[in-house]
Curated annotation (Swiss-Prot):
Positions of [4Fe-4S] cluster binding: 139, 143, 146
Cited HAMAP family: RNA_methyltr_RlmN
Misc: Reaction proceeds by a ping-pong mechanism involving intermediate methylation of a conserved cysteine residue.
Protein name: Dual-specificity RNA methyltransferase RlmN
Intrachain disulfide bonds: 132-369
Binding-site positions, S-adenosyl-L-methionine: 193-194, 225, 247-249, 326
Any single Gene Ontology cellular-component annotation: cytoplasm
Localization per Swiss-Prot or TrEMBL: Cytoplasm
NCBIfam families: PRK11194.1, rRNA_mod_RlmN
Species this protein is from: Serratia proteamaculans (strain 568)
Main location: cytoplasm
Cofactor(s) in the UniProt record: [4Fe-4S] cluster
């Protein structure tokens, strides 16, 4: 059964994004992590210290353009303020627990978040460098083809743990002001977790990605992927404008109810209506959404499925990414053959859809789509139920 979506998963009506105190008078043992603050919050923090707003901009440039986490190195800030910052604040990104490098250049990092881990994937491709970022430890949505979903939901990541993945990757690859080149050109919120179930932290993190004093990415180069949390998608459109990708994976409700269980709450028609509402507000998407469709052998990959998919998407401007399924231990599916993928793709193109078969990257290090699992201390009710029922538990360490 799909775990209920609670207030722990999603922003409430009365909860603002500025949920963390920015009181600079805290004792040293409770230093505020500046990676938790977007630019507006950082300016409020400096105002409480009696400083001008431009000080926030200066510090932010050091943090994100230089990947600097040492106030003493911020040479255009006076010594008195640097000392004050040392006493009340810190710049602390999550650390790398383990690094794996693929033969194709993909890098997967296991990132320490408290006593647990999430995974972040760096995918270089010519002049593009895409970072796949996690938003939660585990996931509540139980998509059957996804390794992360087998863990269940553990907790939401903080802003500093989300933007910290980008910061840490940029630090490793080489900061903009150090190398003269952007270490990361694109960010996709397609790692572990459902981003729309962590809006309070995902949105401020994306604001930092877009901010000129942050990572300065174009809104067309920051992509949020969702499986269809409709109320949160409607909220997203009022909060920020970024590129949208949807994890559809089925041509009809019967199949999607089984493999993407949130469909039982928000069916395809309801989901696509919300997508069109978002597109109507968005400039980042240039009028169309990216549809993600994982190819599962003899589950959703027939030519009849392709015709149904074309029909269901006829009123939703989109491009379609067909994703070869990437196996993980204990999974009940097989990968569609190349011939079935090719036939499926040709049907969609005959209907006029831009259709791309995604190139699998990093599968030799379990960094491909659907393979991210991380190493977690699993406290979920789902795992407890499995233990009590004597069922096998599939949580793969990195």
């Amino acid at each position: 059964m799909l775990e209920p979506i609670t207030s722990e998963h999603i922003v409430s009506e009365n909860n603002s994004l500025t949920t963390q105190s920015v009181n600079a008078e805290q004792p040293a043992v409770a230093k505020i992590n500046l990676l938790d603050l977007n630019r507006q919050q950082l300016r409020e923090f400096f105002a409480k210290m009696g400083e001008k707003p431009f000080r926030a901009d200066q510090v932010m440039k050091w943090m994100y353009h230089y990947c600097c986490d040492d106030f003493e190195q911020m040479t255009d800030i006076n010594k008195v303020l640097r000392n004050k910052l040392q006493s009340v604040a810190e710049i602390r990104a999550p650390e790398v627990a383990e690094e794996q490098r693929s033969a194709d250049g993909t890098i997967k990092w296991a990132i320490k978040v408290g006593d647990q881990q999430v995974e972040t994937v760096y995918i270089p491709d010519g002049d593009r460098a895409t970072l796949c970022v996690s938003s939660q430890v585990g996931c509540a949505l139980e998509c059957k083809f996804c390794s992360t979903a087998q863990q269940g939901f553990n907790r939401n990541l903080r802003v500093s743990e989300i933007i910290g993945q980008v910061w840490r990757a940029a630090k490793i690859i080489g900061a903009l002001k150090v190398t003269g080149e952007r270490p990361i050109t694109n960010v996709v919120m397609m790692g572990m977790g459902e981003p729309l179930l962590n809006l309070n932290n995902v949105v401020p993190a994306m604001e930092i990605m877009l901010d000129d004093f942050g990572f300065g990415l174009s809104k067309r180069r920051v992509t949020l992927s969702t499986s269809g949390v409709v109320p949160a998608l409607d909220k997203l459109g009022d909060m920020i404008d970024v590129a949208l990708a949807i994890s559809l994976h089925a041509p009809n409700d019967k199949i999607r109810d089984d493999i993407v269980p949130i469909n039982r709450k928000y069916n395809i028609e309801t989901f696509l209506a919300a997508v069109r509402r978002y597109l109507a507000k968005s400039n980042a998407n240039q009028g169309r959404v990216t549809v993600e469709y994982v190819m599962l052998d003899h589950i959703n990959d027939s030519t009849d499925d392709a015709h149904q998919l074309a029909e269901v998407l006829k009123d939703t401007p989109c491009k379609i990414n067909l994703i070869p399924w990437n196996p993980f231990p204990g999974a009940p599916y097989g990968r569609s053959s190349n011939s079935r993928v090719d036939r499926f793709s040709k049907v969609l193109m005959e209907y006029g859809f831009t259709t791309i078969v995604r190139k699998t990257r990093g599968d030799d290090i379990d960094a491909a789509c659907g393979q991210l699992a991380g190493e977690v201390i699993d406290r979920t009710k789902r795992t407890l139920k499995k233990k009590m029922a004597g069922e096998p538990i599939s949580v793969r360490a990195v």
